[in-house]
Amino acid sequence: MASDPMSVNSSAREPPAPPGSGADEPKYGGYTRFELELEFVQALGNPLYLNHLASRKLLSNPAFIAYLDYLQYWSRPPYLKYITYPGPTLKNLELLQQEKFRQDIISPDLVERLRLEGMKAGIDWHRESFPSTA
């Protein structure tokens, strides 16, 4: 099943062409590989989703770990600009490269800490970007 965008062999593939590059990407269920991989990599910004992946034992699957390594292309231009929340998304993608983190994310305490850190970062960013006039 080498044509599957998330197959074991996907880690050896080149990243998909970004929109507007003129490349004619095949569709999988109506979506391009670019769209599917963008949706998935953005989901990695959610600590609860990472915990779900760990509970399903995906974070100990060598093929899945290779896929996470492959997805690091999202941290570089021209792909970076398409990520809605690059801070938590890329932080978690980087952390997922570490075996210890992949093991530890099963802990509800770590999930809650990451969730609270993300909320605090969002609040701090909002305060810096839109200071009150009072």
From Swiss-Prot:
It holds the Pfam family Med31. Gene3D superfamilies: Mediator of RNA polymerase II, submodule Med31 (Soh1) (1.10.10.1340). Residues 1-12 have a biased composition (Polar residues). GO terms for biological process: regulation of transcription by RNA polymerase II. It comes from the Eukaryota. One of its GO terms (molecular function) is transcription coregulator activity. Belongs to the Mediator complex subunit 31 family. This is Mediator of RNA polymerase II transcription subunit 31.
